[in-house]
Every structure is written in C-alpha cells, then in structure tokens.
Curated annotation (Swiss-Prot):
GO terms for cellular component: cytosolic small ribosomal subunit. This is Small ribosomal subunit protein uS2. Required for the assembly and/or stability of the 40S ribosomal subunit. Required for the processing of the 20S rRNA-precursor to mature 18S rRNA in a late step of the maturation of 40S ribosomal subunits. HAMAP family: Ribosomal_S2_euk. It comes from Enterocytozoon bieneusi (strain H348) (Microsporidian parasite). It holds the Pfam family Ribosomal_S2. InterPro entries: Ribosomal_uS2 (IPR001865), Ribosomal_uS2_euk (IPR027498), Ribosomal_uS2_euk/arc (IPR005707), Ribosomal_uS2_flav_dom_sf (IPR023591). It is found in: Cytoplasm. GO terms for molecular function: structural constituent of ribosome. One of its GO terms (biological process) is ribosomal small subunit assembly.
Amino acid sequence: MSDSSIKMPPVFGKLLLATQAHLGGVKVTKPMKKYIYGERQDKVSVFDLKKTWDKFILAARAFCGLNYGDDVTVISCKTFGKKPVLKFAETTGAKSYTGRFIPGSFTNTTIRNSCEPRLIIVSDPIVDKQAIEEAAKVNCPTIAFCNTDCDLKYVDIAIPLNNRSPKAIGASFFILSRIIRYIKFGTPMDQDIKEVELFFYRDPIELEKLQEDQNEDNYNEIFNKFSNANEDEFGKIIYK
C-alpha cells in the first residue's frame, strides 16, 4: 500500500537516478520481483522508485517509533559503507557498527562492546548476514537495503535499491536520515541537499586524483592571469 502522506522531493528522485540507485542486477530472486519496474536491453533490472520511496517512509517511521535513537544499530561490513553509516549515526543518534561483525555481538553479553539493539539497519543483507541472523535470534527487526539478488530471510523492511554502488549507498543513507529528521522535527527534507557529499565514500586514489585536478585548475587559473595581463597588471598579480 502506498503511503502518500509524504511526497518524494523531486531532488531526491534526481539523486537516486544520478547515483544509479535504481539499477539492480541481472539475477532477480523471487521476493524481489515485486519491486522491479522493468528491464533494460542488457537484462539489467530497473527498480520501481515509487516502491523504493514507500519503503524509505516505512523504515523512517519504524526508526521514529523508538524513543531513543541509540536503540538502533546501523551496520555495514563493506569498506565503502563505513562513511555513510558513521554519518547517518551522527545525524540520527543511532549506534554505528562498521568493519567485520564479531559473532555474538547481539547474543553474548560477555563480548566486549556487545549491545542489545531494538532495531538494526544493514547496507547489504548478503554481506551483513551474520548480523541479521543474530538479530533474528533476539527478536530484533531488520531494515536492509536490498538488491535484486538478495534473499529477504529475516529482513522485515526491505528497501529495494542498488546496494553495490558506493554513491547509491551514500545517497540512500542520506535520504533516510532526512526523512527521519522531517518526521521527528519537521526539518525540510530537501534543505542543504549538497550535504549528501558528506555521506559519500571516496577511496584514497580518487581523493588523490581530485587533489591533482584541483591543483591543475589552480595552476591554469594563475597561468591565464599571467598570460593575459599587461605590464602594469603583471606587477599587481606578482605583488598581490
């Protein structure tokens, strides 16, 4: 059933498309078929973003149904899921769990840093399978970002999207955090949309390339000033 009480801001739709969150894979499991809008010529499935949005709303309402944000644990064992998870936790007050999931973290209280969450959010039910199974043992519901090949066993709220893309995962955690803030505090969802950059993972090679491009742009700007300046202006640039 569609939840029409909260409309998707157009900028969110553009963000999901720009980060390719709407693109699934070639393999589609039976539970995920209902979230597919169509198929491209290369057999890649395309998600129905209207259904994705409805699941975003449902997940946000489940989060807001708890009295305290730290009752929720957000998990990602993926390298590129670390930054969006940490930023989401910072924004919403949830607990974060990144890197390798230690077996028994939810079921064995003698383990260091063990916790008893009332709700967990995972970036990939395949990679984060151990966390989902342990949550099920302690009757803790699970929200998961699910691709077309995901098995929804023990997943209570599946948000259908491309969870293999670092940009898509970052955008998805950003959107979910904005919906939660809107429901809790009435903060406009599309306010300061550029903050989505804070949720994006960038590997060291990409950061180095960006730095090189920036340095090159600065060099070109200075070079153009010198080449286009007359004698008087040249002196002003040098001693500015």
